[in-house]
Structure formats: C-alpha cells, structure tokens
A protein has these predicted regions:
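Carboxylate/His-rich catalytic cores and anion/metal-binding grooves
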Residues: 1, 100, 106-109, 119-124, ...
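Acidic (Asp/Glu)-rich catalytic clusters
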Residues: 82-87, 117-127, 205-207, 228-232
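Solvent-exposed loop/turn segments at secondary-structure junctions
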Residues: 66-69, 99-101, 140, 241-243, ...
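Hydrophobic faces of well-ordered beta-strands that scaffold small-molecule active sites
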Residues: 61-63, 90-97, 127-136, 181-183, ...
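His/Asp/Glu-enriched, well-ordered alpha-helical/loop segment
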Residues: 44, 172-182, 189-212, 216-217, ...
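Distinct, well-ordered alpha-helical segments
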Residues: 75-77, 106-113, 191-204
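Catalytic pocket of metal/acid-base enzymes, prominently hydrolases
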Residues: 1-94, 123-175
Length: 378
C-alpha cells in the first residue's frame, strides 16, 4: 500500500495527515493500484464502459492515459480481452502518457522504445497508434489549472504537472519519431506554454501536417485562439466545462468577465481550427449528443445562456464528434463519415440533430449502432 514515506517523497500534491493525494501526488498512488487489473474486476468495469458506448452511439474511443496506473502491458491486454469478447464491437485507440514513464524513471528514448514494443500487441480493434500524451497543468474541476494574469481572484494558484525541461525532452523525442502529440492543457497560462512548445518544435523540425492537439481547452484568450490557428494546431475540447463549471468560475475564481467565456469554441470554429469534442468520461457524460448540445447552446447549470459569441454551429459540433474527431486521431481515412471504402461504423438516431429544437438536442434517442456493417439495436 501507500506509505507516509511515499507521500513525503512527493514535493506537491500529497498530504498524509489528510489522506489527500491529488495531481502530482497521484504518482505515489497509481503504481500501487495494480489490483485494478485483476481480470474479473477489470473485465466487469470494461463491460460496463462498452455498454455505455453502445447506448450513446459511440463506435470508437480514444484512451489518452494508457499506462497511468503503472502497468501498461497488463492494461493493454485487459482492454484487448474486453473488446474481443464484446458482442457489438468497438474500436479503441490507446495513447501512452508522459507521466507513466516519468513515474517509472524512464528516459524519453526508453519511453519511445517501450511504446514500439507495445505496438506489437496491436489488433484490428485495439491499437497503440503513433500518438503521445503530454501533461501541462492541473485539473479544471479542482481549480488547479494554470491561469494567466490576473490569475485566480481568490489568490490561489494552479499547478504545473511536468516541468519545462522534461516536457520539451519527451515532446521532442516523439515529435522527431513521427508521433502526433496531444497535450493536457486547461488554463490560459497552460495554453501559452503549449503554444511556446509548438513554436519550438516547428522551428527545430518543421512539419506541415503535425496535428498537435490541445486537449481539454477550459480557458484561452482570443489572441491565443488566433495563434493556435496560425500554428496549425488542433483542439480536442470538453464543452461540458462551460455547462457545469462556468457559473462557479464566474465567482471568485475567474470573475464575471472570464468565467462565462470558458471553452471558446465559436472563436476556434470561425478561424478554421480543427475541433473534436470529448467527454473525458466521467468528467462529462459519455454522450456525443450531450457534448453537441453544450457546445451549441452554451447554457450553464442555472439555465442561463452565457458567452453566446462562443457557440459552435450545429454542423460544426456534429463534425466535432464524427469526421473532425476522426481527423484529430489520424483516422479520417477509415472512420468518421459514411463513404465508400471506409469502415461502416455509425450511430442510428431517432431524430436529425441538425433540425430539432436546441433544447431537444441532448434528448435524441440513440436507436442503435452499425459497427463494421452489422446493425445492433439498443
């Protein structure tokens, strides 16, 4: 189990007296959680998750934190077994994460070599692709994202998940190896660090179609959105943040000017930045229709519509859970739209999401899915 010595070894994020481990402190906890991969236990959890995917019309999922519990090979094999036994069928893209390798003391080169070994385990439906996940700042739900000036109005500060030298070293290693980079980034100070990193990588080793993706995108400035577009970045956003958090953030954290502007997707869409919408389940419901609704309506928990200039169009939101999401994963030639030569994977809905009243968008029923050309009714 976790000991007091484990907690004391963590500079920030572990309080033994309170039994509180968060952000960087989880590095002391996750390596001790191998029991989660006990076949019966893990299999039950995966069956529940796959059932949620089917109910929501999701045919492909991306795990952006493979290895976070410290036993990546066991994790990959467990996911493979669960997907292989699923009667409906799904596709799962597994993405290695920087914190796994740092916790285990691996160098960037050792991490790359290990990921190549994992790729030998790939199957048609479960694969470790040429993607790598970076971590920049803390979580938005805990108020530990890094916000630029004037920062949090109550005076507290966020956390950096990885120092700049390590962030740069791992990013450079995988960028040069031809991997697509994804970076967990929530606050606008973290967005600035993402932009600086992308500028550095492009200057050192230019690429035309790099698709480096900012993940989560809780808060950014208009100037930063302009810069993301100019650099050819993509954004995979969680629009649910605006619905569930913007009212609270509009108080003594960000204030009434910044809080309602969380998740500025309308600005990105107008600038032509490729956008995907994700749930980061269970941070948001595993429901593409709910994600569409939050991006299009921009209501908060009280039902107020705020930051309306940052609404996405319905077509833009639909693309963000289909073809544009596939593009961000580098899978646009095989999934994401119904076209000759692609896998016949799609959801069957009770109503057209482009024509129902906005307040009914998230209530559309998922009748079933078609996976690899075979229909399955919910």
């Amino acid at each position: 189990g976790v000991t007091e010595a484990d907690a004391d070894a963590i500079e920030e994020g572990a309080n033994w007296e309170r039994g509180h481990f968060y952000e960087l402190g989880l590095r002391a906890v996750f390596p001790k959680m191998g029991f989660l991969f006990e076949p019966t236990r893990y299999g039950r959890g995966m069956r529940n998750f796959l059932a949620m995917m089917h109910e929501s019309g999701v045919t492909t999922a991306a795990d952006m934190g493979t290895g976070i519990f410290g036993n990546p090979v066991a994790e990959i094999k467990a996911v493979r077994a669960a997907v292989a036994s699923d009667p409906v069928g799904v596709r799962v893209l597994l993405t290695p994460i920087i914190t796994d390798f740092m916790t285990r003391g691996q160098s960037p080169q050792e991490a790359l070599d290990e990921v190549r070994e994992w790729q030998a385990l790939n199957t048609e439906r479960v694969a470790v692709g040429n993607h790598f996940k970076l971590m920049i700042d803390g979580a938005i739900f805990s108020g530990l994202s890094q916000m630029g000036a004037p920062g949090y109005l109550d005076g507290h500060s966020g956390v950096w998940m990885v120092d700049v030298p390590n962030l740069t070293a791992f990013a450079e290693q995988f960028w040069d190896a031809g991997f697509q980079l994804h970076a967990h980034s929530n606050g606008d100070a973290a967005t600035a660090r993402f932009i600086e990193l992308l500028e550095y990588l492009l200057a050192k080793n230019p690429k035309r179609d790099h698709r480096m993706t900012l993940e989560h995108f809780a808060y950014s400035t208009e100037d930063q959105n302009r810069k993301l577009a100019a650099l050819g970045a993509a954004v995979s956003a969680n629009p649910y943040y605006h619905y569930i958090l913007s009212e609270m953030y509009s108080g003594d954290w960000l204030g009434p000017d910044r809080g309602p502007q969380m998740v500025r997707l309308g600005s990105l869409e107008k600038k032509g930045v490729p956008i995907g919408l994700h749930s980061d389940s269970p941070m948001a419901p595993l429901s593409p229709l709910t994600l569409m609704w939050t991006a299009v309506a921009r209501e908060n928990l009280s039902g107020e519509r705020t930051g309306q200039a940052e609404r996405m169009t319905r077509m833009g939101a639909l693309k963000a859970v289909t073809i544009d999401a596939a593009w961000i994963l580098g899978l646009e030639n095989s999934i994401g739209s119904i076209r000759a030569g692609k896998a016949a994977d799609f959801a069957i809905l009770s109503h057209d999401p482009l024509s129902v009243p906005i307040n009914q968008l998230r209530s559309i029923k998922v009748v079933g899915t078609v996976f690899a050309g075979i229909a399955h009714q919910n």
